[in-house]
Amino acid sequence: MNKKELHDFIKEKQPNICQISCYKDGKEVYSDEWNNYKKIDTCHVMSATKSIVALLVGIALDKGFIKSTDQPVLDFFPEYKIKRGEKTIQKVTIKHLLTMTAPYKYKYEPWTKICSSDDWTVSALDFLGGRKGLTGQFKYSTLGIHILTGIISKTSGLKVVDFANKFLFEPIGVEKHINYLAETAEEHKHFTICKEPQKNIWFCDPKGIGTAGYGLCFSAIDMAKIGQLCLDKGVHNGKQLVSSKWIEEI
């Protein structure tokens, strides 16, 4: 497929594509943009944010901020007041959150209740657990795993975006990101569905903790750099940024 054929295909079949970055042998060999995007522009990568957070958890493990993915979630929130009669949340681990096997006390994600709260981590904890116990059943969650970024922030003493900048983004050449907090529910909704070019931002809750299930804005070249890091088993320019064991595990 030549460039003209690619452009014709995207125009006819994939009009939502805004950027492409192709790597070969560790170097970018082709890039292109559509829909008024520039190469440096970012877009909301939505649930791909979850994969970036998984890498950050691995880095937190490497640096000793987290001891093990088998650690109970409540180890990190000893001040959390467990609801009366709740017997499941005490057993939920980081691994349950990462593998989407954590149990939640809802059928449909409580966007309004969590996103209107002052502390999304605590609000997410309020919905963790339940009467059914640990079933091992897969339950996809976008809001519940906000607990993961809460753990990273609490153990490292850094805002998640600063943790990511220091230990992942800047080392591989991704531009420094900053937090973005929506002031209204309407602004929040607009951000989640907006297809216009964005800046280097990570959506956050009122506490400044980056959302774990969505909210990160990356360019295609940023995504390619993450992909290359994973292909290279966590090594960039001879430096191990995240353990190869973790790359294999995730």
Regions found by a protein language model. Name each.
Residues 4-13, 38-49, 55-140:
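Active-site-proximal loop and beta-strand segments within enzyme catalytic domains
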Residues 7-38:
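A short, well-structured edge-of-sheet supersecondary motif
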Residues 26, 46-65, 97, 138-169, ...:
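Alpha-helical scaffold elements that line and support the substrate/ligand-binding pocket
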Residues 32, 122-130, 197-207:
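The feature captures the short pre-catalytic strand/loop hairpin that immediately precedes
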Residues 39, 107-185, 209-221:
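Catalytic-site signature segments of enzymes, centered on catalytic residues
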Residues 63-102, 155-213, 218, 245:
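Active-site helix/loop module of the DD-peptidase/beta-lactamase fold
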Residues 107-108, 233-239:
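Substrate-binding/catalytic groove segments of enzymes
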Residues 216, 237-250:
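A penicillin-recognizing enzyme superfamily signal
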